[in-house]
Amino acid sequence: LPGGKSSHHLLPNAATDWSAVETIDDQNKPMHSTMNIYIGSQTKPNTNIVAYSNYPPHFKFELPMSPGKGVIMAEDNNKGFWLVHTAKYFPNLALAIRDLFSNEKTTKEAAAFLCMSYSDVNLRAIAKIIDYEQPIVFFAQKSATVQAFYDSSEIQKLVNGLHKYQPTASASGDGIATLTPPGTVKIFASAPVGYSSDIYLNYIVKIMKKSFQVYTPGTTTTVLRRSCVGTLKVENVL
């Protein structure tokens, strides 16, 4: 939004959908409060962190790969959050909270932030979904006290990459509630390159009866078939 560091947030019961929260890094504002959970902590080494972006702090230019940007943080009491955003040079976790939005690359263009709290079990499931974006992980930290989350197969695959997918197929749907119901339907599906059945048309499409997008692992060299039948659309993203 115009005005340097001006910011707005969504409130479901507000008189207007977009409510002003003044300067984004002012104390007690949404982003300040969220990021200060870690930056202001006296036990930073006890936090599990995975941060990914195609324009991380200190990079000279934007990388042309996966555009996904986000941060997963999990504490030692089985909870954490997933912050999805579009900001460049964010977050530089070495900075003080007052300097988090000090870089011109971060404030020059408008950016969106969406933060969701989850249990560590659900965060691992989210990590598995994020992995299909083939994100560029620029910062990762393993908790010094509770390491099971970081050592889980989902987080390890997200951080280290270069893994192989087993010959299985699965599908799941997730309805997203917004200020204008019914919202958006997201579909996540996976199938090996050599799978004998066309899972996308024979299974998912018949069940969901909606347009959706199919994500395939970014390491594959095989482009799956596109199909558009009526209102149904299947698109491959490599």
What are these regions (language model features)?
Residues 1-238:
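PLD/PLD-like phosphodiesterase catalytic module centered on the HKD motif
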